[in-house]
Amino acid sequence: MLRVVSWNINGIRSPLQGLACQEPSSCPTALRRVLDELDADIVCLQETKVTRDVLTEPLAIVEGYNSYFSFSRSRSGYSGVATFCKDSATPVAAEEGLSGVFATLNGDIGCYGNMDEFTQEELRVLDSEGRALLTQHKIRTLEGKEKTLTLINVYCPHADPGKPERLTFKMRFYRLLQMRAEALLAAGSHVIILGDLNTAHRPIDHCDASSLECFEEDPGRKWMDGLLSNPGDEAGPHIGLFMDSYRYLHPKQQRAFTCWSVVSGARHLNYGSRLDYVLGDRALVIDTFQASFLLPEVMGSDHCPVGAVLNVSCVPAKQCPALCTRFLPEFAGTQLKILRFLVPLEQEPVREQQVLQPSHQIQAQRQPRKACMHSTRLRKSQGGPKRKQKNLMSYFQPSSSLSQTSGVELPTLPLVGPLTTPKTAEEVATATVLEEKNKVPESKDEKGERTAFWKSMLSGPSPMPLCGGHREPCVMRTVKKTGPNFGRQFYMCARPRGPPSDPSSRCNFFLWSRPS
């Protein structure tokens, strides 16, 4: 059996926070414990949010696994995918990206198809965010036949409604993904596409599809309609070459969600959407998929893992592909040249006369150190007269030699003001009485404002209003969407978001904290 698991981890360090490790990124066994709990031969992670310069050895080298990373080249702490294969499932080839732009011609997979509709610059941009990683494996069927299986670990872009250019980017990425997958399939390899596709395909895959305008007309859903097919569909030019393994085995399963809003606490009531998939070519899904599952009990991210079990065995390669993380120079154990660590530094100009020193001291400092050492040895060898112990009072006497030999003028302190004699007690009392008489009496309004201010400061914040549906204290939120209300605060029900028919879910109470 071959078990594969995919998980949008929302930062590869996130699930490690709950482990007993003071510094998760330096804990040598933390990530292995996470991988072992997933109990899979191949684990595909999305949204790792690490770049190569911050990748540490405990995250890259895990005992019993060989790992492969794709990093974002455009932004730091953004996107990124990684694939961890058990040594018993070592791939025969691995490649970063979908287009071949970052291919190294050493252990790559190939089979790109006709990409003439893309420019080289567009392909580079599509692959520069570290959203796709391919591993190719040898598998053996129950009949003993060896075949090729290519896994495409993918993290598809999210289309921000406020940024229409991101929708274009997302659809072009979808197009590139489909072309590469179909080219691999045409070359004779079985193909699995697994990861976060960032689209809920059908109304059954969304908690509130009825409230979304033109749900089925969404460009991402229409793309999935063309990519996928149903079990009963007959093969043809307009039939998708891939199948959704979960819907193939669980066609009517309700509330099978994989992603929830953290802000609204929707996971408590399972009010989310299914964005994570394990897709396979039709023949592979129908012939070998024994199970397709979700793991909503696994915490640590706003997504839960998804996976599948195939009725095949993996034939491990004798050697890891060149893309394997253990072959990176920083982890390979090879000695690096010192020139890689040397960076020319700009020296600041020496500031002259930062500290005033007597001229005889400056001349003494400018003498070569070698001459000083020579004169010291000479005095010791000649055995000259020893210095007598000085009297303590000599340190408090003015030195005449210093003023004679030094040409430095010492600054003089200017007088602050004329010297005055201290006032008597009667004069102080008289001045105090005059000062009190000259004071302007404080008005009642000013006194009242000051009293109210200190009362509000000492009494603490006002109590939260009660929501209308449950009569429970509300929570305060801040508007973060750009617009006329940006930055304003409001009160809303503190319960998690859920189905409107569920009485334990959030009610529709809303109140601005301050009137506009």
Swiss-Prot record:
Q: Please classify the protein's predominant subcellular localization into one broad category.
A: nucleus
PROSITE patterns from the UniProt entry: AP_NUCLEASE_F1_1, AP_NUCLEASE_F1_4, ZF_GRF
The record lists Mg(2+) 2 as bound by D196, N198, H303
Describe tissue expression: Expressed in lymphocytes, thymocytes and splenocytes (at protein level). Highly expressed in the thymus and weakly expressed in the bone marrow, spleen, eye, kidney, lung, brain and uterus.
Recorded hits in SUPFAM superfamilies, A to Z, give: DNase I-like
How does its record describe regulation of its activity? Answer: 3'-5' exonuclease activity is activated by sodium and manganese. 3'-5' exonuclease and 3'-phosphodiesterase activities are stimulated in presence of PCNA.
- The protein here is known as DNA-(apurinic or apyrimidinic site) endonuclease 2
